[in-house]
């Protein structure tokens, strides 16, 4: 006999979702008395009457916020939708106009709500909200509850995606999941589009998760860690992202030209040592040249995929076996500098600010270490002369500041 109440939370915590269906749904009979009935979610458009939504928010002590960006970035556009929920299964939204000035006018009508210290704001990822509101001249002063950060504090080793958290705490799968796996169904207004229903669904789920995650933080004794360490850090990281980083594109262009020249020279040297031209970036072709033609390591075996491994770890061990090895390692290093940094970094410059705004993720590593994405600014190389040149391309955004 399988005890569902014991296995179900274990499977979900370990993200063994296929086993939830295969084992729990097939090997046991469901207790239909505990099945959740369908729930109706109201979704009201206040685009033509923001005042009525404002009144609803003014009367509420807490509200969930879900913001939709379709075009542009946090730094050069405004949201297309602002979705709010002040009650369970009741969602209201504003569809903002495409005209940026008109959109900003509507956003500013909510300034008093966002700056009210007595209100609780529930968000799936409040750092983004802090940033776009700051652009609008609004300082978010609500008492914040961040779903992602709360779940990270409770479960640092697993995903904090909203859909993942909804499944774990509400036994609910967001739209896009297979119907047969769905434990709870939310019914929406048939006149609303599928996209609007998706926004309503997420907003309602955010509202529902607040109480459950709060209870968990209190019961586990982690509320102080959440309030005193993690949430203050959210605001610091938001300020860092908002400030951005400036780069000297002319310097990077010059570095790119130098790297290309060196890559071309090394490429020709590799061809001479191999006595043929081939795609150096192809592991298959490189493996055949090194181990079949040049016979560098007669004991080197092929992998299960049927080709030789040419990873850096493998090549470093063979450095003394043939001069072509060091050339290949140099080629790869320069190629990475060129494609990952010298050529790629300018593409991350936001057209609205002229700066790079990386994303700092504090809910990624269980150890608490921050990660940096789009682009990763934490692994700019410094070991080689070429890598240090890349770092020189990072400059201050103002002549009154210096890098130390």
Task: Describe each PLM feature range.
Residues 110-111, 391-393:
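A generic local secondary-structure boundary/capping motif
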Residues 71, 99-101, 130:
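Short acidic, S/G/P-rich loop/turn micro-motifs used as interaction or catalytic elements
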Residues 49-50, 103-107, 126, 386:
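Amphipathic coiled-coil/heptad-repeat helices and related helical stalk/stem segments
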Residues 404:
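An acidic, glycine-/histidine-flanked metal-binding catalytic module
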Residues 78, 85-90, 105-216:
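Charged catalytic and DNA/RNA-contacting regions of genome-maintenance
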Residues 1-97, 121, 157, 185-195, ...:
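Conserved "right-hand" nucleotidyltransferase catalytic core of DNA-directed polymerases
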């Amino acid at each position: 006999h399988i005890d569902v109440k014991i296995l179900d939370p274990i499977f979900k915590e370990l993200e063994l979702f296929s086993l939830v269906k295969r084992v729990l749904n097939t090997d046991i009979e469901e207790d239909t008395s505990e099945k959740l009935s369908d729930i109706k979610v109201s979704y009201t458009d206040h685009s033509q009457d923001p005042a009525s939504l404002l009144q609803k928010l003014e009367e509420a002590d807490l509200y969930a916020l879900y913001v939709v960006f379709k075009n542009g970035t946090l730094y050069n556009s405004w949201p297309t939708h602002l979705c709010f929920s002040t009650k369970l299964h009741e969602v209201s939204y504003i569809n903002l106009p495409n005209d940026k000035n008109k959109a900003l006018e509507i956003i500013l009508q909510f300034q008093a709500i966002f700056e009210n210290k007595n209100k609780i704001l529930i968000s799936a990822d409040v750092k983004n909200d802090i940033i776009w509101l700051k652009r609008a001249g609004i300082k978010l002063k609500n008492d914040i509850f961040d779903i992602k950060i709360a779940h990270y504090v409770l479960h640092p080793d697993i995903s904090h995606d909203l859909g993942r958290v909804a499944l774990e705490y509400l036994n609910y799968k967001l739209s896009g999941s297979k119907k047969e796996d769905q434990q709870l169904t939310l019914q929406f207004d048939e006149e609303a589009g599928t996209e609007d229903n998706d926004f309503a669904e997420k907003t309602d789920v955010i509202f529902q998760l607040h109480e459950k995650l709060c209870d968990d933080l209190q019961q586990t004794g982690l509320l102080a860690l959440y309030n005193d360490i993690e949430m203050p850090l959210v605001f610091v990281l938001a300020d860092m992202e908002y400030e951005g980083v400036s780069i000297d594109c002319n310097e990077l262009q010059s570095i790119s030209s130098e790297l290309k020249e060196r890559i071309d020279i090394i490429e020709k040297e590799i061809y001479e040592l191999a006595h043929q031209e081939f795609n150096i970036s192809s592991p298959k072709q490189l493996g055949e040249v090194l181990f079949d033609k040049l016979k560098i390591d007669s004991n080197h075996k092929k992998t299960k995929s049927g080709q030789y491994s040419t990873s850096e770890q493998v090549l470093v061990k063979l450095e003394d076996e043939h001069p072509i090895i060091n050339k290949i390692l140099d080629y790869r290093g320069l190629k990475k500098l060129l494609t990952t940094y010298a050529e790629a970094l300018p593409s991350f410059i936001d057209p609205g600010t002229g700066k790079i705004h990386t994303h700092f993720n504090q809910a990624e590593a269980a150890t608490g270490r921050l990660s940096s994405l789009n682009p990763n600014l934490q692994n700019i190389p410094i070991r080689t002369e070429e890598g240090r040149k890349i770092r020189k391309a990072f400059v201050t955004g103002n002549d009154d500041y210096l890098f130390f």
